[in-house]
């Protein structure tokens, strides 16, 4: 979490109101203190980090908190990841999650729908597929929303955690591609809703740099060699077509260069049958 204590309390209250078995909660403070928040009787634990490790780094700390002693396996079958300024709209969301994972043993990740609490609208960028005009349509997808999702812990056991070095942007797609390559499925569920104020992504220089750098890292880490220049080239063209400002474009190209000249972490190119699978799901890994 960051520095939104009122919103966090509302979120925790909405989690506590969920039907079915109680949900154990871990709140990760990224460079902030969490005084008085831990409540063992209510199943709430806290982890205070001395610095901000970024979105994937902080979530990896939360994942680690659910590992069994010795790091072999987990104390839970499914982990929920919720933004600290969100709110679960319904009381049956956790039960819907349990039902989804129980009924489909190949389901690895569920992406919730994010809706504005005032208007009820879902922003197009919060629908994790190319055909995003109807956010009320649930479907099988190729990625997921980082601030509102559920992941089967066996996915982490098999393919590893989120890429902490990404810090911000595209870490979900990195995990999604690895999960899909391992045979897991990802669903977008319009009936599982996290209320979250509609916002625009930050458009500062750091944002543009990380988006560009992580696009390159994503391709270098996960795509067959033949597709790496195609994927990166398509996103270069799309960026230019959007006509960003001069400072934004300068930051973007700085990140683009950084993506090629710095370590992206381990390279594990997906199988060609996974490329075809992504294509059949409506999002070939070139866009």
Language model feature labels by segment:
Residues 49-72:
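Glycine-rich, basic loop-to-helix element that forms the pyrophosphate-binding segment
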Residues 116, 133-151, 173, 203:
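A recurrent flexible, glycine/aromatic-enriched loop bordering the glycosyltransferase active site
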Residues 143-151, 155-160, 165-193:
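A short, conserved alpha-helix in the catalytic core of glycosyltransferases
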Residues 71-87:
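Short beta-strand-to-loop acidic/aromatic patch adjacent to the donor-nucleotide binding site
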Residues 182-206, 215-218:
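Active-site donor/metal-binding and catalytic loop motifs
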Residues 210, 225-287:
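Non-catalytic, C-terminal membrane-associated alpha-helical segments of glycosyltransferases
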Residues 87, 91-123:
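Conserved donor NDP-sugar-binding/catalytic core segment of glycosyltransferases
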Residues 13-22:
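Short, acidic, metal-binding catalytic loop of nucleotide-sugar glycosyltransferases
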């Amino acid at each position: 979490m960051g520095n939104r204590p009122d919103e966090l309390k509302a979120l925790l209250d909405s989690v506590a109101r969920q039907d079915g078995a109680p949900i154990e909660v871990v709140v990760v403070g990224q460079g902030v203190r969490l005084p008085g928040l831990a409540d063992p009787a209510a199943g709430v634990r806290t982890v205070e980090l001395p610095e901000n490790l970024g979105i994937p780094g902080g979530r990896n700390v939360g994942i680690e908190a659910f590992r069994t002693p010795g790091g072999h396996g987990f104390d839970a079958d499914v982990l929920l990841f919720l933004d600290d300024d969100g709110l679960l709209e319904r009381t049956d969301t956790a039960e819907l999650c349990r039902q989804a994972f129980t009924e489909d043993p190949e389901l690895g990740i569920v992406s919730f729908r994010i809706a504005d609490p005032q208007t009820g609208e879902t922003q197009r960028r919060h629908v994790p597929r190319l055909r995003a005009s109807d956010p009320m349509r649930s479907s099988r997808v190729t990625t997921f929303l980082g601030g509102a999702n559920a992941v089967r812990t066996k996915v982490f056991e098999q393919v590893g955690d989120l890429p902490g070095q990404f810090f911000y942007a595209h870490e979900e797609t990195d995990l999604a591609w690895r999960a899909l390559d391992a045979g897991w499925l990802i669903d977008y569920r319009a009936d599982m809703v996290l209320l979250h104020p509609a916002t625009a992504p930050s458009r500062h220089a750091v944002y543009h740099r990380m988006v560009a750098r992580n696009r390159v890292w994503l391709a270098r880490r996960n795509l067959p060699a033949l597709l790496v220049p195609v994927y990166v080239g398509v996103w270069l063209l799309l960026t230019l077509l959007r006509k960003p400002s001069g400072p934004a474009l300068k930051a973007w190209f700085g990140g683009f260069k950084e993506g090629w000249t710095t370590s992206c972490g381990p390279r594990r190119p997906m199988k060609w049958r996974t490329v075809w699978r992504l294509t059949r799901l409506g999002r070939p890994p070139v866009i």
